[in-house]
C-alpha cells in the first residue's frame, strides 16, 4: 500500500436529514480520497465515523495530526470519531446529540464492542476549516483524547512543543494519541500494512516518525512492559478501552514531517503483563494512564486517583504528584511563589475549605518572611515530614494496630471490644490467686460453661471478679466479648458498651448481627440498666446468627449487676424476663469489700439498699440543712465533689466554680486523628471492575469466592481445624467498595500465624492476578497497597465521626490555675482513673517536662502532634500542658492521651483516635454517672432538688469507702425507695455455696464440643513447635559432629 493510501472504514450508520445510509468497510486509494470527502461534505452530514481498520485486534492505534485550529466562521471539513473508546465529535452540538440519541436507542456499538459515548464538554466541532488544507491538499482532522471514558475537559492541555528548525509555520502542539483496543485477535504489524508483527522490535525507523513513537513509548515503559506479556504468560482479559497521552518533546522528533498529511501508524501492544513491583508501599499489577494512579493525599489523608478534584485543586500551590513515589510534592515552584506573593499582597484569600493542620502549617510557612528558595524548601520538607510520620507505622505486607490497642491473646476479635483500658495499676496485677474464697468459687463455677448471673450489692467486688473471669476464659483459648451497659463500667472492664459492640441503634435493633457469631462467651456488666426487650432481642439474634437452636445460640452469657441499684429508664426491668429466669444459674456475692473498714456504715447501706432508713444513719453520716450547706461549702467543704440530679446542674456548677477562679482561662480542644486499621492485616488488594457499572457485579458471589480462596490456604496451615468458611468470612475477610469502579480487599492475619505462613499467605494472595480473570468474577487485580492509610470510605468516616462526637473526651476542656480536676485514664501506679487533683500551673508541652512513663516513642509522637495542633490550628504561641497536684507529693505535667473509638466491622475495622488531655472538671457529677465508681475525697450529696427515685439514694451514698467523706443536704425519708419486685428477686438469690444447676440448663458449645475450643489447638501448636526445636537441635548436633569428623 502506498504512503498516500488512507484507511477508511465504516463504523455503522451516519445520519442525514432525510434518511440513513450504510457505508461498507473498504479501503479507498488516495485518488478517490478527495472525491469521497467532497461528496460527504456537500451533504447535510451530521456525523462521519473514521475508525481504525485494525480495531478488532489487540493493537494500539497511533494517530498523528498537525493542523491549525478551526477559525471562527469556517466550514468544518472533516469530523472524526475514535472507534476504540467511542469519543464522538459531530459537526454541531445538535447533530451530535441526535446521533447519540439514535445510537443509544438502537444499542449500536463500535467494532471494538465499546458502547458509543461522547464527552459532556467535547460537543463543539474539533475539525479544521476548509482553509486548513495540507500540502497534499487533503483536509485532515484532529483527535481529542479522552482518558477512560472521561471527557478531555478533565485532562490538562498539553504544552506547546518546540519543533525542529524549519520554515516558520503556525502549528499547534504535536500530540501522540495512543488508543488501546479492547478485543484480542490478530495483531497488526508495526506500520499498519503487511502481516501482523510484534511490538518489541519495530522496523528500522530511526529516522522516521514511527521510530520516534517507538522510542517515546519505550522510554515511558509502556512498550517494554507490554512486549514481555507472553513471556510471563499472564493476561488480565478484556477491559474497558483506555488512551494514553504521550507528549513528543522537541528533542525526540527525529525529523520534521515531509508534508502535513495525516499519517496512520499502528503499533501492536501485547496483553498487560503483571509486574512484580519492588516498591515498598505499593505494587502495581498493571500500567495505568496519566491521572489514574492511586495517590495518598496527605492533606485529606485519603487515597485518591491522581486526577481527582482534591489533587487538581493543589495545583494552585504548585503541589502535584511525584510519580516516582506516588506522593505529593512541589512540582511547580513558580506557581507556589506566585500564590505566595498574591496571598501576602492580599490579592487572594486562603480557601475556607483548607482547614486541616497541614494546611495551617503550610499557610504559616507561606506568610513567613523568608527567601524564595528557603520557602520552597520548607514546603517540600513539610510535606516529606508528614509522609514520614505516616510511614513510621507501616510494615511491609503486614498492617499492625496501634501500639496502645489492647488485643486479647488467642482472640481474633478481641481488639474490637477491648479498646480503652481503665483498670488501676494494682487491679491489672490481680489474678485468680488474689481473689477471696467466695470469688474463687464463682470463677470455678463459671468455667463449667453455664449461663450465669452474678448478683451482689455495691462494693462486693463484681467488676474485679469479671476481669479475672475474662482472663481465665481467654487463657483457655476462647473469644470473649467484654461489655457493659454504661461507658464508665465498660472502661473499668477494659471493654466496650453493649450498644457499641453489637451496633444497637436507638430503636434497640442489632445492626451488626454478624458480630454475634464471633464469640464463645459474652460478658455484660451493670445489667440492672439492661431492658427486658433488648436482652430478649440479644438472645434471638444469637440463636439466629449461630444457627443453633439452643439458648443464646450455644454462646455462654455471663451477667453481673445489682437490681437494687439504678435501672433502665422507661423500660421493663430484666427481672421480668422469662428468658433470664429460665436459662441462668443465679448466685449472689455476700462479702462487702469496699467498706470493710466501717462495718456499721456497710450495714446501714444494706438497709438503704432494701428501701429502709437506718435509725442511726445521722450518727454516721453528716446531715446539713440548706443554710448550713452554704456555710459548709464555703468553709470546710470547699472543693468537695457534688452529686446532683441532672447534667444541666452539673455543667452549671462546674462552670460556676471555674468562673470563680481569678486566673486566665485556657481551652484545650480534642484532636481527631485520621482513621487507622485495628489489628494485623495483609496488604490491601485493589480489585477493579471490568465493566464500568459495578452494579452488574455479583458482590455476594465475589465475596464467597474470595472466602473460599483464602480458606484453601488456611486449611493447609498447622491450625486448619480452627477455620471454616463461615468463620473465615466473618472474622478474616474484608471486601468493600472503595471507588466507583474498584473494591478493596484484605485478610486479617491470625494471632498465632508464623512469619513463614505470613509470607506464604502474601504469595497466595498474589495469585489473585491470574485467578480472578480465570473465574470470570468481573474484577481484576489492579494494585497492591501495603499501607491501609486513607483506604476508608466516606461511610466509615461518617460513622467514626459520630462515635467520636459522643465520646466524653471529645469536648473541649476548659481549665484555670486552681481548677479541681479528675483523671480520666491510668498514667502510673497511684495515678489512675478517678484520681482527684488541682491544677497548679502550666508548662511547655515538650518531652523534657513530661514524666518518665511518657518517654516512649508512641507517646512522644502523640505529644509532638498535639503540640503542633495547638500551635497551628488554635493559635497557641507556645503549646502548654497543665501541671496537676494529685496530693502526696505527686505533681506532674499531664500529657495528652489517645482514646480510640470504632474498630468494628461496620467501619471495615477502622478506628479513629481522639487525642486530648485526660482530665475533666471535678466539682460535680450526676448520680447515674458515678454508678460503678469509688470516689476519693469529700463528697457532698445535694438532695434539695432531687425527686424520689428507686435505689438512687443508695447508689449515691455507697460511692465512698468511709462515711466521714460524705455529707448530705436536705435529706428526707421519702427519698429512700426500693422496687418491690427487685427486692423479692434479690432475696431469692442463693449464696455461691448453694448455686443450683437445673436439669434443663445447657452448657455452652465451647464446653460441650471440645473441638471448638482453642486450647487443644494451642497444645497442638506447642507440640509442633517443640518437635521442630528438637529436630533443629538434632540437625545442629549432626552438623557439629560431621564438622569435627571432617577436621584432620
UniProtKB/Swiss-Prot annotation:
It holds the Pfam family PIF1. Residues 951-971 bind DNA. GO terms for molecular function: 5'-3' DNA helicase activity; ATP binding; ATP hydrolysis activity; DNA binding; magnesium ion binding. It is found in: Mitochondrion. It catalyses: Couples ATP hydrolysis with the unwinding of duplex DNA at the replication fork by translocating in the 5'-3' direction. This creates two antiparallel DNA single strands (ssDNA). The leading ssDNA polymer is the template for DNA polymerase III holoenzyme which synthesizes a continuous strand; ATP + H2O = ADP + phosphate + H(+). Its EC number is 5.6.2.3. One of its GO terms (biological process) is chromosome organization. Its cofactor is Mg(2+). Transmembrane segments: none annotated. GO terms for cellular component: ciliary plasm; cytoplasm; kinetoplast; mitochondrion; nuclear lumen. The keyword RNA-binding does not apply. Induction: Protein level is regulated by mitochondrial proteasome-like protease HslVU. It comes from the Eukaryota. SUPFAM superfamilies: P-loop containing nucleoside triphosphate hydrolases. Keywords: ATP-binding, DNA damage, DNA recombination, DNA repair, DNA-binding, Helicase, Hydrolase, Isomerase, Mitochondrion, Nucleotide-binding, Transit peptide. InterPro entries: AAA+_ATPase, DNA_helicase_pif1-like_DEAD, P-loop_NTPase, Pif1-like_2B_dom, PIF1_helicase. SMART domains: AAA (SM00382). Residues 1-41 form a transit peptide. ATP binds at residues 456-463. Residues 1034-1048 have a biased composition (Basic and acidic residues). Residues 187-206, 1012-1048 are annotated as: Disordered. DNA-dependent ATPase and 5'-3' DNA helicase required for the maintenance of mitochondrial (kinetoplast) genome stability. Essential for replication of kinetoplast maxicircles, but not minicircles. Belongs to the helicase family. PIF1 subfamily. Monomer. This is ATP-dependent DNA helicase PIF2. The lineage of its organism: Eukaryota, Discoba, Euglenozoa, Kinetoplastea, Metakinetoplastina. The gene is PIF2.
Amino acid at each position: 500500500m502506498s504512503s498516500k493510501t488512507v484507511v477508511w472504514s465504516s463504523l455503522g450508520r451516519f445520519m442525514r436529514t432525510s434518511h440513513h445510509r450504510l457505508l461498507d468497510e473498504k479501503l479507498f486509494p488516495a485518488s478517490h480520497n478527495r472525491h469521497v470527502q467532497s461528496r460527504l461534505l456537500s451533504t447535510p452530514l451530521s456525523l462521519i465515523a473514521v475508525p481504525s481498520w485494525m480495531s478488532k485486534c489487540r493493537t494500539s492505534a497511533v494517530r498523528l495530526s498537525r493542523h491549525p485550529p478551526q477559525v471562527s466562521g469556517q466550514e468544518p471539513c472533516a469530523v472524526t470519531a475514535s472507534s476504540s473508546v467511542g469519543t464522538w465529535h459531530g459537526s454541531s452540538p445538535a447533530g451530535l446529540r441526535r446521533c447519540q440519541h439514535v445510537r443509544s436507542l438502537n444499542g449500536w456499538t463500535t467494532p471494538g464492542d465499546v458502547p458509543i459515548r461522547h464527552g459532556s464538554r467535547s460537543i463543539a466541532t474539533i475539525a479544521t476549516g476548509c482553509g486548513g488544507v495540507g500540502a497534499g491538499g487533503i483536509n485532515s482532522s484532529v483527535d481529542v483524547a479522552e482518558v477512560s471514558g472521561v471527557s478531555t475537559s478533565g485532562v490538562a492541555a498539553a504544552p506547546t512543543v518546540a519543533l525542529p528548525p524549519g520554515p516558520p509555520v503556525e502549528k499547534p502542539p504535536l500530540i501522540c494519541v495512543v488508543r488501546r483496543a479492547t478485543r484480542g485477535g490478530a495483531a497488526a504489524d508495526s506500520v499498519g500494512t503487511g502481516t501482523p508483527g510484534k511490538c518489541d522490535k519495530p522496523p528500522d525507523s530511526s529516522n522516521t516518525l514511527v521510530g520516534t513513537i517507538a522510542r517515546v513509548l519505550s522510554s515511558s515503559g509502556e512498550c517494554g512492559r507490554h512486549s514481555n506479556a507472553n513471556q510471563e504468560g499472564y493476561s488480565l482479559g478484556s477491559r474497558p478501552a483506555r488512551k494514553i497521552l504521550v507528549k513528543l518533546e522537541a528533542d525526540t522528533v527525529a525529523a520534521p514531517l515531509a508534508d502535513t498529511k495525516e499519517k496512520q501508524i499502528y503499533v501492536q501492544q501485547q496483553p498487560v503483563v503483571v509486574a512484580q513491583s519492588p516498591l515498598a508501599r505499593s505494587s502495581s499489577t498493571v500500567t495505568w494512564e496519566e491521572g489514574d494512579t492511586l495517590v495518598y493525599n496527605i492533606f485529606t489523608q485519603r487515597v485518591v486517583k491522581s486526577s481527582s478534584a482534591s489533587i487538581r485543586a493543589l495545583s494552585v500551590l504548585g503541589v502535584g504528584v511525584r510519580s516516582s513515589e506516588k506522593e505529593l510534592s512541589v512540582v511547580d515552584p513558580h506557581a507556589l511563589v506566585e500564590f505566595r506573593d498574591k496571598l501576602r499582597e492580599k490579592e487572594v484569600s486562603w480557601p475556607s475549605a483548607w482547614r486541616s493542620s497541614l494546611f495551617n502549617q503550610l499557610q504559616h510557612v507561606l506568610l513567613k518572611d523568608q527567601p524564595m528558595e528557603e520557602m520552597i524548601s520548607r514546603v517540600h520538607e513539610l510535606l516529606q515530614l508528614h509522609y514520614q510520620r505516616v510511614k513510621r507505622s507501616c510494615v511491609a505486607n503486614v498492617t499492625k494496630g496501634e501500639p496502645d490497642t489492647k488485643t486479647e491473646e488467642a482472640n481474633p476479635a478481641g481488639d474490637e471490644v477491648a479498646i480503652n483500658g481503665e483498670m488501676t495499676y494494682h487491679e491489672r496485677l490481680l489474678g485468680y490467686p488474689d481473689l477471696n474464697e467466695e470469688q474463687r468459687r464463682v470463677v470455678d463455677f463459671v468455667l463449667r460453661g453455664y449461663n450465669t448471673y452474678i448478683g451482689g450489692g455495691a462494693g462486693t467486688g463484681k467488676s474485679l471478679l469479671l476481669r479475672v473471669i475474662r482472663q481465665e476464659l481467654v487463657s483457655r483459648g476462647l473469644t470473649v466479648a467484654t461489655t457493659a451497659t454504661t461507658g464508665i463500667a465498660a472502661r473499668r472492664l477494659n471493654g466496650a458498651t453493649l450498644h457499641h459492640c453489637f451496633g444497637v441503634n436507638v430503636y434497640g435493633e442489632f445492626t451488626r448481627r454478624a458480630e454475634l457469631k464471633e464469640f464463645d462467651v459474652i460478658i455484660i456488666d451493670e445489667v440492672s440498666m439492661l431492658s427486658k426487650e433488648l436482652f430478649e432481642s440479644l438472645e434471638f439474634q444469637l440463636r439466629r446468627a449461630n444457627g443453633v437452636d439452643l439458648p443464646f445460640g450455644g454462646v455462654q452469657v455471663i451477667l453481673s449487676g445489682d437490681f437494687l441499684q439504678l435501672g433502665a429508664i422507661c423500660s421493663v426491668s430484666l427481672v421480668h424476663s422469662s428468658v433470664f429466669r429460665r436459662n441462668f444459674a443465679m448466685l449472689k456475692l455476700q462479702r462487702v469489700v469496699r467498706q470493710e473498714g466501717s462495718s456499721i456504715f456497710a450495714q446501714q447501706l444494706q438497709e438503704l439498699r432494701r428501701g429502709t432508713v437506718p435509725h442511726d444513719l445521722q450518727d454516721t453520716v453528716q446531715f446539713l440543712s440548706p443554710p448550713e450547706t452554704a456555710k459548709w461549702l464555703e468553709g470546710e467543704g470547699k472543693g468537695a465533689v457534688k452529686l446532683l440530679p441532672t447534667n444541666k446542674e452539673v455543667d452549671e456548677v462546674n462552670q460556676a466554680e471555674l468562673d470563680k477562679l481569678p486566673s486566665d482561662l485556657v481551652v484545650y480542644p480534642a484532636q481527631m486523628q485520621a482513621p487507622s486499621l485495628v489489628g494485623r492485616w495483609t496488604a490491601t488488594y485493589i480489585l477493579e471492575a471490568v465493566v464500568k457499572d459495578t452494579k452488574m457485579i455479583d458482590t455476594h458471589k465475589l465475596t464467597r469466592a474470595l472466602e473460599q480462596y483464602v480458606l484453601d490456604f488456611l486449611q493447609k496451615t498447622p491450625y486448619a481445624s480452627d477455620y471454616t468458611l463461615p468463620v473465615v468470612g466473618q472474622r478474616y475477610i474484608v471486601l468493600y467498595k472503595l471507588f466507583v469502579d474498584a473494591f478493596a480487599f484484605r485478610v486479617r492475619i491470625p494471632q498465632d500465624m508464623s512469619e513463614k505462613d505470613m509470607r506464604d499467605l502474601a504469595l497466595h494472595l498474589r495469585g489473585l492476578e491470574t485467578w480472578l480473570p480465570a473465574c470470570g468474577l468481573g474484577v481484576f487485580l489492579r494494585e497492591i497497597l501495603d499501607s491501609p492509610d486513607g483506604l476508608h470510605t466516606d461511610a466509615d468516616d461518617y460513622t467514626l465521626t459520630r462515635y467520636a462526637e459522643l465520646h466524653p473526651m471529645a469536648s473541649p476542656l476548659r481549665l484555670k490555675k486552681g481548677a479541681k480536676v479528675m483523671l480520666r485514664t491510668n498514667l502510673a501506679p497511684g495515678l489512675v482513673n478517678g484520681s482527684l487533683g488541682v491544677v497548679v500551673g502550666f508548662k511547655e508541652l515538650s518531652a523534657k517536662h513530661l514524666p518518665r512513663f511518657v518517654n516512649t516513642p508512641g507517646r512522644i509522637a502523640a505529644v509532638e502532634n498535639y503540640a503542633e495542633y495547638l500551635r497551628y490550628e488554635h493559635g497557641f504561641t507556645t503549646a502548654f500542658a497543665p501541671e496537676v497536684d494529685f496530693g502526696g507529693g505527686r505533681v506532674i505535667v499531664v500529657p495528652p492521651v489517645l482514646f480510640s473509638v470504632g474498630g468494628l466491622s461496620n467501619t471495615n475495622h477502622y478506628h479513629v483516635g481522639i487525642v486530648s488531655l485526660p482530665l475533666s472538671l471535678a466539682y460535680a457529677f450526676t448520680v447515674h454517672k458515678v454508678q460503678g465508681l469509688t470516689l476519693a475525697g469529700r463528697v457532698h450529696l445535694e438532695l434539695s432538688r432531687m425527686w424520689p427515685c428507686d435505689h438512687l439514694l443508695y447508689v449515691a451514698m455507697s460511692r465512698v469507702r468511709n462515711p466521714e467523706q460524705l455529707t448530705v443536704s436536705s435529706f428526707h425519708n421519702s427519698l429512700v425507695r426500693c422496687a418491690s419486685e427487685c427486692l423479692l428477686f434479690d432475696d431469692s438469690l442463693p449464696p455461691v455455696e448453694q448455686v443450683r444447676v437445673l436439669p434443663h440448663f445447657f452448657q455452652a458449645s465451647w464446653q460441650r464440643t471440645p473441638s471448638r475450643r482453642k486450647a487443644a489447638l494451642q497444645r497442638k501448636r506447642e507440640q509442633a513447635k517443640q518437635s521442630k526445636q528438637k529436630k533443629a537441635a538434632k540437625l545442629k548436633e549432626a552438623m557439629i559432629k560431621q564438622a569435627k569428623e571432617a577436621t584432620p
